[in-house]
Amino acid sequence: MVLASFLVSGLVLGILAQQMRPVQSRGVDLGLCDETRFECKCGDPGYVFNVPMKQCTYFYRWRPYCKPCDDLEAKDICPKYKRCQECKAGLDSCVTCPPNKYGTWCSGECQCKNGGICDQRTGACTCRDRYEGAHCEILKGCPLLPSDSQVQEVRNPPDNPQTIDYSCSPGFKLKGVARISCLPNGQWSSFPPKCIRECAKVSSPEHGKVNAPSGNMIEGATLRFSCDSPYYLIGQETLTCQGNGQWSGQIPQCKKLVFCPDLDPVNHAEHQVKIGVEQKYGQFPQGTEVTYTCSGNYFLMGFNTLKCNPDGSWSGSQPSCVKVADREVDCDSKAVDFLDDVGEPVRIHCPAGCSLTAGTVWGTAIYHELSSVCRAAIHAGKLPNSGGAVHVVNNGPYSDFLGSDLNGIKSEELKSLARSFRFDYVSSSTAGRSGCPDGWFEVEENCVYVTSKQRAWERAQGVCTNMAARLAVLDKDLIPSSLTETLRGKGLTTTWIGLHRLDAEKPFVWELMDRSNVVLNDNLTFWASGEPGNETNCVYLDIRDQLQPVWKTKSCFQPSSFACMMDLSDRNKAKCDDPGPLENGHATLHGQSIDGFYAGSSIRYSCEVLHYLSGTETVTCTTNGTWSAPKPRCIKVITCQNPPVPSYGSVEIKPPSRTNSISRVGSPFLRLPRLPLPLARAAKPPPKPRSSQPSTVDLASKVKLPEGHYRVGSRAIYTCESRYYELLGSQGRRCDSNGNWSGRPASCIPVCGRSDSPRSPFIWNGNSTEIGQWPWQAGISRWLADHNMWFLQCGGSLLNEKWIVTAAHCVTYSATAEIIDPSQFKIYLGKYYRDDSRDDDYVQVREALEIHVNPNYDPGNLNFDIALIQLKTPVTLTTRVQPICLPTDITTREHLKEGTLAVVTGWGLNENNTYSEMIQQAVLPVVAASTCEEGYKEADLPLTVTENMFCAGYKKGRYDACSGDSGGPLVFADDSRTERRWVLEGIVSWGSPSGCGKANQYGGFTKVNVFLSWIRQFI
């Protein structure tokens, strides 16, 4: 840059320099600098031209220099000229702009339409004819409107009409205005009209009327129908004329109103009534809906909603509300587990085949609470053996339960007072075998019952079982929408529904909500507590999410609503008839449906003890509805029960002989027929063909017998335990085909009156005996409290192991018939010495249990002087302890003849007036009663010998029974047998008041034969 040619004084420049120091970045126009020029491009691609730029003075280190003012450069000036179409040096704007551009520097975009011209400076549009608006976007006049094909129009003028006249083709009527005009705002005065067909006129229905608008019946016209009382409208209440000339529906009719009959009250139910027609002339006009809800713990059986049909009938039978047992029922279940309040029925469902199982039933029609409830229902005729539902009713306290044999079940009698029950039928509410019961709905191949009643899982399962179903089970990915819709319709969001495992071969994996996995190793239904991986939780279905139901678990004991399910496929299977009970047998059922025997189910039979099965063990229900084989029979095995074992004996049972025994007497084959030899051989029967089926004998022989039963042909061999007994009856008995033992019952009778001492003649004078010579001799000691000792005061005779016979006066208080307490006596058997200290081990001492004195005993004259003592413990028969024989009428006639000798024994007073230390014996002859009475009369001691007494002794006296011998035996020898036996004919009873062994004063004895009937009442 060149400075101007004139000079500036140093002073001026210095002042300017001082003033410029704070703003050294800006120049000053001092008029000292010339213009400069920038080369810029006009337009794109355009051309190059020069743009003049003014310069200002700048200072650097106090020296001035020139450059464009404001530090402008070419890059700051040239770009704006590129938008111009034509440029001019020195002009601070574009001369002209390219098309559709306007403004000083052509930066605006023209918005003119329809051929409008844009102003280069302002952008304003200059419009062509027929267009207006800021951008020439508006066509002057109104736009043309479309019309229907049946509409005819005349435009005026044709190109830019200001009016349009409309008309219709023949057969159509104009709907709307006939002329429209174009308004100043460019809008037509109305919409174009339409040409529409006219609908036919409609007359009032019979028993009703129609309300129609005035004028033509064209599209949009509405008819309103109504009926006279008591008729109601069948069809649409309003009809509208459509554009095609047709009404919107069929012309309705008026039909006379029909009423359904009144409904009976349903116990334990609430109901809501919704009237189905506008008129309310009666309680239940057609269309009425009645909805039932059971209260409390009652479940609805049947449809919950009934509708009154047009024919005056209800859509279904009335439902019932019943209590349903919440425990599963089997053939062993007792009624006590299901009874409710008195008179209250409870529904249970019995499985099939209960008449084939064991179980006690008490009563007829009314049953004891501990009875098998299903067997009782069959007995009462309320259920068949194929099972089914029944109502159990608490009948309250009852007694005198009667037994009977009904419907293949035998009930027992019971007299005790107890709670009782009876049965009511369950009314059928099914829609046939192939459909679902009333109130159930079909889900695929199942019938489902949904309830809002809440139960713990196990209780819910029990309710379902007693409704002939099971708790519902679904597959994880197959949740029917009909089920979820039903649940939502009942307001149930969480319901016990089990999750089914599909593959038994693979572990079942179930994804929980927390995304953890539970692996189960078997094909059980994953819902019950106690299953693998599921100790206390059960599965339920949660449908709170409207889009996606989810499976969850919670405590099995927590109540929840639930769904029951029954399989429809079973109901479509062939069904076999109930085979009925197996007499004397039992049955195990496999695969049967809950309400009968369907194809594929089977029954396995078995027999009770002592019976065998004749026929097929297992029968199966085939697809044609018949059993694969007839029902078998249980045939009784004939046996004999344990034969009675005689006291003091034994019996040995030997099995049937495997070889034929040969009779030694009367055998028919000991004589041969006189036939020719060939004929004799041919007379033998041909061998019987062998059967592949086991015979009844073979089957019976394979039955295991319980203890105490023996097969036909078994033999019972009897023996007595020792030689002191003899066997009476049959020694051997055989089990006959009638189940009885042959022969007579055996018994072991003590051998009586036998002495093991050497057989010797009578010894006439009294003397000591040998040890064991008189083994029936008993010593009776009485406790003397005053002397603190036992005293041997009487004798007695052993009749058998437990009974002693003695004199009545030995066991009663003196001069009375009052019996002394049995505890005051001890009885000795096998005793020889009076002194107890000299007794050996063969002496048996027993206590008295009971004492029986003849009721006619007279202590004044000692008539009926006889008594029996029962021992607490039986004695053991030995050489020194054996019973005496009782007399018979024959022996008494033979022995009680005058002069017949007998032996009396005892420890009584001897001739020295002391008690014998050893047992003594004396031989006495029988004396006639008259002689006895005469002798005492001569001694001035008159007495009477009754028919219950006899006398024995010597005229001269000396040998006699005496004090201490009372009650002892007077025995006679019986030599009528091979072996001598001794018979008890008398009991020492009384003697002379003057003493023992007095002349003509004989001893008195009780006549034993007179008292045999009385004795046999006890022994």
Swiss-Prot record:
It is found in: Secreted. The active site is at 809 (charge relay system), 865 (charge relay system), 966 (charge relay system). It comes from Tachypleus tridentatus. InterPro entries: C-type_lectin-like, C-type_lectin-like/link_sf, CTDL_fold, EGF-like_dom, LCCL, LCCL_sf, LE_dom, Peptidase_S1_PA. Expressed in hemocytes (at protein level). Residues 102-137 form the EGF-like domain. Glycans are attached at residues 523, 534, 624, 740, 767, 912. Residues 325-421 form the LCCL domain. SMART domains: CCP (SM00032), CLECT (SM00034), LCCL (SM00603), Tryp_SPc (SM00020). This is Clotting factor C. GO terms for cellular component: extracellular region. GO terms for molecular function: carbohydrate binding; serine-type endopeptidase activity. Belongs to the peptidase S1 family. Keywords: Cell adhesion, Disulfide bond, EGF-like domain, Glycoprotein, Hemolymph clotting, Hydrolase, Lectin, Protease, Repeat, Secreted, Serine protease, Signal, Sushi. Residues 763-1019 form the Peptidase S1 domain. Substrate binds at residue 960.
